[in-house]
Amino acid sequence: MSSRKRKATDTAGRHSRMDPNLSSDDSQNPGAVAAANREVLDAGREDIISSGTERQQARKEKQDLVQEFEEPRNKVLQENREKFSRIMTSSFSAMEVKIKDVLKTHCEERQKLCQDYSLQFTNLNRKLTSDAYKLKKHAETLSNMFMEQQKFIHESLTLQKNRMEEFKSLCEKYLEKLEVLRDSRGNSIAEELRRLIATLEIKLLMLHNQQKTAAPPQSLLDVLFS
């Protein structure tokens, strides 16, 4: 505490200690009381002014101290900020390059994949088209063959039917001829038998006539086979 402040405090204390001991006559002397009060007020005013100056000085010293510590701190913060900015810039640059490389690689792989599968799909589509064309041609060939076979089968059945009818007609004719032949053969045999019997009768009659004329006798077998 400053000497001026201690002096004002002692004066105020002294006046305060003196006030209770004032005699009742002091109330009858207002001039003395007013003078004493003015002294107290002046001392307090000086004390207030002194206290305000000291506070301003202390505030200035505090500001200087804060500024003294704040300058290195700001410098460190500025350096850290610049370092952080460089690190972030470098990191973002590296990240951007990495992302570009990844995107480029991915794009190249996707293009290669699309080209490979596009080529495979094109070849497969070409093969499917060729197979479908061959299948269509084969189906047309089979259809034509089937129609030809159907036509051939129909013609064969018609020819077979005609031949069966012809065979039936031949069989009927053969049976008719056979029947006629059998009938004619029976008649021929009967006619031949009748002719042989007539010849035998003639020979027997001739033999009988020869016997009558006293010819040497002959056996019946000699007569039959002569």
From Swiss-Prot:
Residues 21-30 have a biased composition (Polar residues). Keywords: Coiled coil. Transmembrane segments: none annotated. Expressed in lymphoid cells. Signal peptide: none annotated. Residues 1-66 are annotated as: Disordered. Residues 8-18, 39-48, 56-66 have a biased composition (Basic and acidic residues). Residues 155-210 form a coiled coil. Belongs to the XLR/SYCP3 family. This is X-linked lymphocyte-regulated protein 3C. It comes from Mus musculus.
